[in-house]
A protein has these predicted regions:
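Positively charged n-region of N-terminal signal peptides that target proteins for export
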Residues: 1-4
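Hydrophobic membrane-insertion alpha-helices, especially the h-region
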Residues: 7-19
Length: 177
């Protein structure tokens, strides 16, 4: 039994190492030539591991936000702007991006830099998960805004909002009270 577990772990590590090495051996110019859907899958895999985002959430958010359907999605266009002024592959608002980033982010960067868009998205999702303690509320807050999720959590889930630092303004810009 221990051998099976060890072999499985080694196999998973070998796959991870292989994908990491493959990316490192592809030149930046060759990587830029890849279809957007392939680059998006790479970013999802890389940053979901870094921020400990479950795969169903990691792929579900771009599926919902910009209709991402995987590496074979030949029509995928991550450069979208919503009617609510959310930008790029993961539909991040500028105020959110600047609230969770260490540097000032521009609309152009959010729209044209898919990697940055994914990083900021997963960083936000991780913060929301740490705050709410469950992925359902974290994804709800990501999608609809903190005030609505706080109301839902208080009324429906009997969630202890006293544990939440209400002075934190991660996404309160999303929905005006």
């Amino acid at each position: 039994m221990k051998k099976k577990i060890l072999l499985t772990c080694l196999f998973v590590f070998a796959i991870f190492l292989s994908s990491w090495l493959t990316r490192n051996y592809i030149s930046d110019s060759d990587f830029k030539k890849l279809p957007e859907s392939v680059k998006m899958a790479f970013y999802i895999e890389k940053y979901s591991i870094l921020y400990n985002i479950p795969k169903n959430i990691a792929y579900g958010v771009p599926y919902y936000e910009t209709s991402y359907r995987g590496t074979n999605d030949t029509n995928y266009n991550p450069k979208r702007i919503s009617k609510h002024k959310a930008y790029g592959a993961m539909q991040i608002k500028l105020a959110t991006a600047n609230g969770i980033s260490d540097t000032t982010i521009t609309k152009k960067e959010l729209l044209n830099n898919t990697e940055l868009n994914v990083i900021l998205s997963y960083k936000l999702l991780k913060k929301l998960y740490d705050k709410y303690g469950n992925w359902k509320l974290a994804v709800g807050a990501y999608n609809t805004g903190k005030p609505i999720v706080n109301k839902y959590a208080k009324l429906v889930c009997k969630f202890d909002l006293k544990k939440i630092d209400n002075s934190e303004n991660i996404i309160s810009y999303a929905v005006k009270d």
